[in-house]
From Swiss-Prot:
Lineage of producing organism: Bacteria, Bacillati, Cyanobacteriota, Cyanophyceae, Oscillatoriophycideae
Protein name listed in UniProt: Cytochrome c6
A molecular function GO annotation: heme binding
GO cellular component: plasma membrane-derived thylakoid lumen
Listed PROSITE patterns: CYTC
InterPro entries associated with the record: Cyt_c-like_dom, Cyt_c-like_dom_sf, Cyt_C6, Cyt_C_IC
PTM (free text): Binds 1 heme c group covalently per subunit.
Record: residues binding heme c: C14, C17, H18, M62
Quaternary assembly: Monomer. Homodimer, or even higher oligomerization, in crystal structures.
Keyword Electron transport: yes
UniProt record similarity statement: Belongs to the cytochrome c family. PetJ subfamily.
Keyword annotations from UniProtKB, A to Z: Electron transport, Heme, Iron, Metal-binding, Photosynthesis, Thylakoid, Transport
Amino acid sequence: GDVAAGASVFSANCAACHMGGRNVIVANKTLSKSDLAKYLKGFDDDAVAAVAYQVTNGKNAMPGFNGRLSPKQIEDVAAYVVDQAEKGW
């Protein structure tokens, strides 16, 4: 995915709950690398695919963005989230 494009998708669609890699709904489930690895199935094998799956389908309080974002936008925002998690937000 395109990390720069993903940054703008994140800003428009995700930042309300996940600004700076945080989670305003469930504080202990952040977008840190360790939390993503703990809560997302398959993160250690393919981090971008695991984040893209979560964004597409949602889970618990998080809505799915399938139909609201294109597959490319989802791939891009997943690449951005993983990139930021690697950098420690």
